[in-house]
C-alpha cells in the first residue's frame, strides 16, 4: 500500500493570519510539522498542499515538496482532493491528512494510524486518532475537539462541547481528537462531493460530514498528545514543550 502524507496549509485565518509561517524556535510552524512527519516510517511521499506563494516559498526553502491547489477550497479535505488529483494517486492509495497546525505531532502517532489502515483494509471509510485529556482546562475549551466512540472504536460523534456529559459523576475519561486523518484516494473524492452536513456546519467540524452521511470512522487512541496552534498564545506553549522534548 502506497502512503502519501499531505499537509493542507492556508495563509488566511481570522484568529491567526499567517499561522503556517509563524516562527517557533526559529523555524516556521509548517517546517516543524513537515520534519516531524518525515520521521515517521512507511511514508512514500510528503507534500504541503497550499494556494499561497509565501507558504510555497517557505516549504521549498527548507527542502520540502509542495502541491499548489486552487484558492477556492472550502475545507482542508477539499484542498487534499485537489492535491491528490494533481498527484495522480491510485484509488486504493492511502492518504494521510495531517493538519498544518500540529507542530508537535509524534511520528509514532502517524505510524500508528498507517498501521491501523494496513491491518484492516476496507473495514472502514476513514481513520483518525484521539488522546485522553489530562489537562482539565481542555475539557471545556471549544478549541479542543472532543470525541466519543463505541466499544469497537468506531466514532459516534465529535464536538466542541464536552462529551460525554456525566450527569452524576465526572470520574470518566474524556478524549480529544487529534488533527490527522487517513483514507483512500477513492473515498476522499466521494467525500468531497457530499453536500455540507448540518452538524458539520453547526460545529465547524468537517469529519461530521462523514458521520452524517453514514460513513464509518475508525478511532485509535494515541499515547501522545499533539497540541494544536489556534492562537499566537499557543506558540509559547509549543516552544516550552520543544525546549524539553
Curated annotation (Swiss-Prot):
This is 8-amino-3,8-dideoxy-manno-octulosonate cytidylyltransferase. Activates KDO8N (a required 8-carbon sugar) for incorporation into bacterial lipopolysaccharide in the Shewanella genus. One of its GO terms (biological process) is lipopolysaccharide biosynthetic process. CDD domains: CMP-KDO-Synthetase. The keyword Cytoplasm applies. Its EC number is 2.7.7.90. It is found in: Cytoplasm. One of its GO terms (molecular function) is 3-deoxy-manno-octulosonate cytidylyltransferase activity. Belongs to the KdsB family. It catalyses: 8-amino-3,8-dideoxy-alpha-D-manno-octulosonate + CTP = CMP-8-amino-3,8-dideoxy-alpha-D-manno-oct-2-ulosonate + diphosphate. It comes from Shewanella halifaxensis (strain HAW-EB4). InterPro entries: Cytidylyl_trans, KdsB, Nucleotide-diphossugar_trans. Keywords: Cytoplasm, Lipopolysaccharide biosynthesis, Nucleotidyltransferase, Transferase.
Amino acid at each position: 500500500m502506497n502512503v502519501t502524507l499531505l499537509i493542507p496549509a492556508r495563509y488566511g485565518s481570522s484568529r491567526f493570519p499567517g499561522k503556517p509561517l509563524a516562527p517557533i524556535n526559529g523555524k516556521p510552524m509548517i517546517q516543524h510539522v513537515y520534519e516531524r512527519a518525515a520521521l515517521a516510517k512507511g511514508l512514500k511521499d510528503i507534500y504541503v498542499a497550499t494556494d499561497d506563494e509565501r507558504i510555497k516559498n517557505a516549504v521549498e526553502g527548507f527542502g520540502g515538496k509542495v502541491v499548489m491547489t486552487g484558492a477556492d477550497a472550502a475545507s482542508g479535505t477539499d484542498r487534499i482532493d485537489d492535491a491528490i488529483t494533481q498527484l495522480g494517486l491510485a484509488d486504493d492509495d492511502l492518504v494521510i491528512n495531517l493538519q498544518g497546525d500540529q507542530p508537535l505531532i509524534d511520528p509514532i502517532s502517524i505510524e500508528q494510524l498507517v498501521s491501523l489502515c494496513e491491518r484492516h483494509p476496507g473495514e472502514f471509510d476513514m481513520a483518525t486518532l484521539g488522546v485522553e485529556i489530562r489537562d482539565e482546562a481542555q475539557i471545556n475549551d471549544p478549541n479542543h475537539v472532543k470525541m466519543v466512540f463505541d466499544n469497537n472504536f468506531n466514532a459516534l460523534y465529535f464536538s466542541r462541547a464536552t462529551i460525554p456529559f456525566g450527569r452524576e459523576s465526572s470520574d470518566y475519561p474524556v478524549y480529544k481528537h487529534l488533527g490527522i486523518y487517513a483514507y483512500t484516494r477513492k473515498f476522499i473524492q466521494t467525500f468531497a462531493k457530499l453536500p455540507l452536513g448540518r452538524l458539520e456546519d453547526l460545529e465547524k467540524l468537517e469529519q461530521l460530514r462523514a458521520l452524517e452521511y453514514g460513513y464509518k470512522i475508525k478511532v485509535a487512541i494515541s499515547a501522545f498528545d499533539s497540541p494544536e496552534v489556534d492562537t499566537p498564545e499557543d506558540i509559547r506553549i509549543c516552544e516550552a514543550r520543544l525546549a524539553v522534548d
